[in-house]
Amino acid sequence: MLILSPMKNRKIRFLFSFLFALCCVGLMFIIYTLSSEDGYASGQRSANVQEIIKESVHEYMDSTEIGQKLHYVLQSLIEAISPDGDNWYQTIRNIAHFSLYFFLALLLYITFSIAGISRLWKIILSLLICLGYALFDEFHQSMVIGRISTMDDVIVDMCGTLMSLGLCWIISAFCACLRSKPRPRL
């Protein structure tokens, strides 16, 4: 086992914290860039992704028995999520919002973990940063030609954030529990 001096350990923690913070900023830049696209470009990107996913999904679902059962479940889910029924377009956009903020919250949590911040503060800071950025992003998007700003997007963003932070909380609590249990002597 490699033992590092406290000074070297601090430098390594700072370096990793800085690298993860850069990843957070990079993901925020990607979100900002996607929100900066005008309505037509954004719609085209979503339509292209939608077609790729639909082709892949339909090919799998038509060729296997499990796929046919999965098709029924997914169709029910899409109808429950989307008031328009089979609205792949909106569902894919919601999944994109959810996923981006899921990973942003995860990166923030990891950054704060490496920096040595307590578990509760990691959750609070990650949640506040994601909420603030989601609100800023929707405000910014409202000023882009052909785009609208909706609180529904902020809600989906926060669902991704809360799911990520919930999983982080559970995993860190489980790891803390494992560390605190005395090990049996052999």
Question: Where do the language-model regions lie?
Answer:
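Bulky hydrophobic segments
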Residues: 2-142, 151, 158-186
